[in-house]
Curated annotation (Swiss-Prot):
The gene is AOX1. The keyword Electron transport applies. Binds 2 iron ions per subunit. Its EC number is 1.10.3.11. This is Ubiquinol oxidase 1, mitochondrial. Homodimer; disulfide-linked. Residues 1-41 form a transit peptide.
Length: 321
């Protein structure tokens, strides 16, 4: 009899515990849905912060400002509000005001590295061969041509920087700043692409071509850099020489009136600190100057390897625009 009573008592306690647990899980689930966090968000968020969040969520659900995106994070990370020098709000989240600059248009555009060694000649003719299908496909559609060029040109800096980063970690040594310089180059090329996306609206088959070309080129350049960094940097230097030529032809078409000289995209005006009222021609000018700087950096990097030295032994041209 006593054993039966103890069992029934234990069952009642267990049922009560299950009921309480269910109630608590419901409350926790409600808090999780409201605050976007977990159990810990209840214990770490201050009451005032919770009230602010509740107001924001309430306004959003009530059809307040539909453009305002309310992102609630348990980690307490809030994007900082950035303003320009004139006090207006900075609207780009892909780059910051301190990452902008004025392009050096005085750079020598005619510089050329004559191919003398076998590797130089192989790099030179590889670029020439790659240019032929581009000429056939895009012809004089220089906006789309620039878009394709930049999807390829943004790869070498990322590949080289990634491999140098891994090498630095393996050998427990500094990279001489080259890791940062090459990633800056890749980021700069990516901004070229973001700019020309505003000018040339790619068709579906051009987007498909970009995916194919980028996939092939990334892996080919990765393998090429592993085998011979001097060849990889030299090839990209020649590719940038071709880019300068392409943008020069782009400017000629703009001057002839064959391509409409539309207003410069807002992203280009902020990134290159262009004056208000700038046009597409101004954008092409600064992009061409960027390509000339990348040409110099990569030929310089190849020369360092040709001298039997490593990149870290020479100071990297960080911020060289």
């Amino acid at each position: 009899m006593m054993m039966m009573m103890s069992r029934s008592g234990a069952n009642r306690v267990a049922n009560t515990a299950m009921f309480v647990a269910k109630g608590l899980s419901g409350e926790v689930g409600g808090l999780r849905a409201l605050y976007g966090g977990g159990v810990r968000s209840e214990s770490t968020l201050a009451l005032s912060e919770k009230e602010k969040i509740e107001k924001k969520v309430g306004l959003s659900s009530a059809g307040g400002n539909k453009e305002e995106k309310v992102i609630v994070s348990y980690w307490g990370i809030q994007p900082s509000k950035i303003t320009k020098k004139d006090g207006t709000e900075w609207k780009w989240n892909c780059f910051s005001p301190w990452g902008t600059y004025k392009a050096d248009l005085s750079i020598d555009l005619e510089k050329h590295m004559p191919p003398t060694t076998f590797l130089d000649k192989m790099a030179f003719w590889t670029v020439k061969v790659l240019r032929y299908p581009t000429d056939v496909f895009f012809q004089r559609r220089y906006g789309c041509r620039a878009m394709m060029l930049e999807t390829v040109a943004a790869v070498p800096g990322m590949v080289a920087g990634m491999l140098l980063h891994c090498k630095s970690l393996r050998r427990f040594e500094h990279s001489g700043g080259w890791f940062k310089a090459l990633l800056e180059e890749a980021e700069n090329e990516r901004m070229h692409l973001m700019t020309f996306m505003e000018v040339a609206k790619p068709k579906w088959y051009e987007r498909a071509l970009v995916i194919t070309v980028q996939g092939v080129f990334f892996n080919a350049y990765f393998l090429g850099y592993l085998l011979s960094p001097k060849f990889a940097h030299r090839m990209f230097g020649y590719l940038e020489e071709e880019a300068i030529h392409s943008y020069t032809e782009f400017l000629k078409e703009l001057d002839k009136g064959n391509i409409e000289n539309v207003p410069a995209p807002a992203i280009a005006i902020d990134y290159w600190q262009l004056p208000p009222g700038s046009t597409l021609r101004d954008v092409v000018m600064v992009v061409r100057a960027d390509e000339a700087h990348h040409r110099d950096v990569n030929h310089f990097a190849s020369d360092i390897h040709y001298q039997g030295r490593e990149l870290r032994e020479a100071a990297a041209p960080i911020g060289y625009h």
